Amino acid sequence: MFDVEPIIADHKDVIHDVVFDYYGRRMATCSSDQTVKIWDEDGQGKWNVTSSWKAHSGSIWRVSWAHPEFGQVVATCSFDRTASVWEEVIGEKVSSTNTPTRRWVRRTTLVDSRTSVTDVEFAPKYLGLLLATASADGIIRIYEAPDIMNLSQWPVQHEISNKLPLSCLSWNTSTYMVTQLLAAGSDEAATPTGKVFLFAYSENSRKCVKIDTVNDITDPVTDVAFAPNAGRTFHMLAVASKDLYIVNLRGVTDATDISKLDIQTIKFSEHNCPVWRVCWNMLATMLISTGDDGCVRLWRMNYNRQWRCAAVLKAEGSGPTYEPAPPTPTLATTASATAKFYKKGTIGNQVPWH
């Protein structure tokens, strides 16, 4: 069962992104009011604002948490053409009964983009402290902090150009087939071409290059999200566009050759409206999508390995509705598929059972 509990965010404008930290006990929100808020869960299911500050001089599109191994670090991107990295600093206790003061300090501002920075995301932990940004000029920039104790230095490691403006990106957390795999989407509506692009690190050229395009998705894309790898021999990518898509990526001839992909696209039209955000649970057994209708839909894979909508959570605190489960096999069908055994003889000199 799912409980819907509204949270009074107290933002003065549209909220563009809501992101939980690694443990799910902290939450970051960003808005067109140019502020970022950090929320902490009190252990009783209540969320309280512990920090709030003006982070940019324009609308803030996205916020991303770094892995806790690198400390309490978030990154933000904005319409003001910059991305910023923030670190939480804990001050001294005023008295023995008070908790230490907390504040977020801007460690660096990335100013390479000439247009709006539309998305920002930290790389998986095993790659180190990497940060990728996507911008409206169609460029993906990958930065690296060479010294995790000094977050003021973020040199550009890779710069990937694309013909279309970019609206979103996602790191693949799996090391299967390739160690660095990125997906990016474009919300450009004028050209009827593929709007999802795949990038990977090339050992030959020593840089990240575009390896493929998902040509089946030609509508503007607002979000992409790679599924966590749970022992699969292929990658799954969720795409939010005019409809919801799940893209399966497999190697064609050689499982280790990421440059040759078999791309299978599955389309879901149940939203009947544009889809804005997508995300997975930790085991990639559930996909969550939000649409222009103000509903959150939960998708599960059934026994036939087909994705079906399992529940719809409606806004304004109304209760969830559950989709009917697919029919289970009847007894006759199950019995007909059951193997029958016949006694053919006995074994001599059996060991007595004690």
From Swiss-Prot:
SMART domains for this protein: WD40 (SM00320)
SUPFAM superfamilies (alphabetical): WD40 repeat-like
UniProt-listed PROSITE patterns: WD_REPEATS_2 (PS50082), WD_REPEATS_REGION (PS50294)
CC per GO annotation: autolysosome; GATOR2 complex; lysosome; nuclear envelope; nuclear pore outer ring; protein-containing complex; Seh1-associated complex
Tissue specificity note: Expressed in ovarian cysts.
Quaternary structure, from the entry: Probable component of the nuclear pore complex (NPC). Component of the GATOR complex consisting of mio, Nup44A/Seh1, Im11, Nplr3, Nplr2, Wdr24, Wdr59 and Sec13. Within the GATOR complex, probable component of the GATOR2 subcomplex which is likely composed of mio, Nup44A/Seh1, Wdr24, Wdr59 and Sec13. Interacts with mio. Interacts with Wdr24. The GATOR2 complex associates with unmet in the absence of S-adenosyl-L-methionine; the mio-Wdr24-Nup44A subcomplex is essential and sufficient for this interaction while Wdr59 and Sec13 are dispensable.
Endpoints of the signal sequence: none
Key words, A-Z: Cell cycle, Cell division, Differentiation, Lysosome, Meiosis, Mitosis, Nucleus, Oogenesis, Protein transport, Repeat, Transport, WD repeat
Name under which the protein is recorded: Nucleoporin seh1
Localization per Swiss-Prot or TrEMBL: Nucleus envelope; Lysosome
Keyword Nucleus found: yes
GO BP terms: cell division; cellular response to amino acid starvation; germarium-derived egg chamber formation; meiotic cell cycle; negative regulation of autophagy; oogenesis; positive regulation of autophagy; positive regulation of cell size
Effect of loss of the gene: Adults develop normally, however females display ovarian defects and reduced fertility likely due to the significant decrease in mTORC1 activity within the germline cells. Ovarian defects include adherent cyst divisions due to mitotic delay, accumulation of autolysosomes resulting in reduced number of egg chambers and reduced number of eggs laid per female per day. Spindle defects and mitotic delay results in egg chambers often containing 16 polyploid nurse cells and no oocyte because the oocyte enters the endocycle and develops as a polyploid nurse cell.
Top-level taxon: Eukaryota
WD repeat spans: 10-49, 55-96, 112-153, 161-209, 216-259, 270-309
Organism from which the protein derives: Drosophila melanogaster (Fruit fly)
GO function terms (MF aspect): structural molecule activity
Pfam families: WD40 (PF00400)
Free-text function comment from the UniProt entry: Probable component of the nuclear pore complex (NPC). Involved in maintaining the localization of another nucleoporin Mgtor to the nuclear envelope of early meiotic female germline cells. It is not involved in recruiting the nucleoporins Mgtor, Nup107, Nup153 and FG-containing nucleoporins to the NPC.
